[in-house]
Amino acid sequence: MGLEVHILGTSSARPTNIRQVSGSLISCDEGIAVVDAGEGFQSRFSNQRKRMKTYESYHLKSSRVAVLCLTHGHLDHTWGVLPWLQSMALDNRNQPLLIIGPTSSEVVESLLENTTLPEDTPHSDLSQQFQFWHKLGGTSENLGYQVRWVLGDVSGDRWVEFDTTTGKVIQLPKQPQPQGWRNNRIDALATVHGIPSCAWKLSTKEKPGKFDRKRAIELGLNDEQRAQLAAG
């Protein structure tokens, strides 16, 4: 399959009569990436699953969600995260989930040094929200399934992970990918906003073209050259 994009919300700041706040799904052959989860996200996800099942005979299973990509910490993009995580726990989810988003280089340094966050850190910075959600039960231990909490200084390509068991923050060698993904990947792209933010790109590996054996013979290619072409 290719990539399927399901836009579940595009409204800014608050819902309107015809639009809901941010939340989208990108489905690929290896799973689903969720981009932002504003207020009421799980209800919109549920409604979209019903629509797809009824009209397209297609199952948009929440168990296939492998990663939640957050673009920034404003609540119209994040307020639905914790309720949704709790609901998946009630559904006995056992698949791992990666939650990843942007922060500032100063916050990354503070987290690694285990010092108080800089005074000018916005209240809506994801570092503050992550720690708040952990206190409210958003950990692997409380939810019953593995959740990785990762923040990054996108421009500097520095990534850290919260170890909710020990309370420590660990620096990662590179931006992590959803577990088990081999043919698809996510990448953060720096953007400009009032707080640390990023866009997310989901890309898929190109499949090799069909090997034209007849044309290879006409060109007089040897066995080694043919094997290389056939392998893509």
Model-derived features: where do they sit?
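Binuclear metal-dependent hydrolase catalytic cores
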Residues: 1-232
